């Protein structure tokens, strides 16, 4: 008799996605981050759901409701800190996942890659709106500064900003709509994840060598289910260590002060995972130029498949490209550091150099390195 998982209409989908899926035999731990992102999304949805049961999206009570969750709700502090630090884990996994895609040439699966970029934008938007909800000083001023950037758009900018605010400043209407969007977006993200996986399963997974692995496949279960389970354990361990020992390590102390429109914090900065983009934004003196650079810092990922001129897919056997890739990683760390520093000498100059280097590596140096490596292949 045929196994039920192979004939049942619903179980058949699960079977083809998680059990009998043919997977390359040589994929490394860098391929764990997809499933870890799925775990992060589930953690965020469940903790967020329980937080939403006690949160009020009103400017007068939002801050107090978060305090109430931490003090009075049973294990509320735990749920709140898992949610806050879960976002950090989410972004660590996201950046690792994207980095893996760039290093091993996974961007040649263009549909999967483009849905991935869309997912990245959606997660960033969700995280930004979530940061506004506690209604602390950094929540309020972060919302004011970032939404204000849209005023740089010619002709419609000012109207657009007021339309998003729902008034003439960040106020109750803004908070309410941000809460509504923050609640609905993770479910849209979950739907996009399904599309992401649908496109991925059309082609099958890439592997570290970048060579087609059709002749060497193994079933997903038990090999990669146990491997993913180990990843889940390690991620959960790190998340719980962060939550239980130093839950405020990655947060901003200013956000423990209730929002006050009359008092600007000395250094307005976003959460650590946006600092690299914030540094690129600040390194351009022109407002519209800064906004374009900010958007392009992420959107540049969409150009990578078209800039791929190497005869090899993966960087595994391309030492010049490898050196450039790790320079890019170091550059992103530099930008993250600069984004958290005040706007003064020498940080301004370092930020500008790092921003130019970021775009130069992706748009100019990597294609050049590929050309050189192609020439070396002929020798």
Curated annotation (Swiss-Prot):
GO MF assignments: metal ion binding; ubiquinol-cytochrome-c reductase activity
Subcellular location: Mitochondrion inner membrane
Source taxon at top rank: Eukaryota
Bilayer-crossing regions: 33-53, 77-98, 113-133, 178-198, 226-246, 288-308, 320-340, 347-367
Assigned keywords, A-Z: Electron transport, Heme, Iron, Membrane, Metal-binding, Mitochondrion, Mitochondrion inner membrane, Respiratory chain, Transmembrane, Transmembrane helix, Transport, Ubiquinone
GO biological process entries: mitochondrial electron transport, ubiquinol to cytochrome c
Membrane topology: Multi-pass membrane protein
GO cellular component terms attached to this protein's record: mitochondrial inner membrane; respiratory chain complex III
Binding annotation for heme b b562: 83, 182
Other remarks in the entry: Heme 1 (or BL or b562) is low-potential and absorbs at about 562 nm, and heme 2 (or BH or b566) is high-potential and absorbs at about 566 nm.
Protein's UniProt name: Cytochrome b
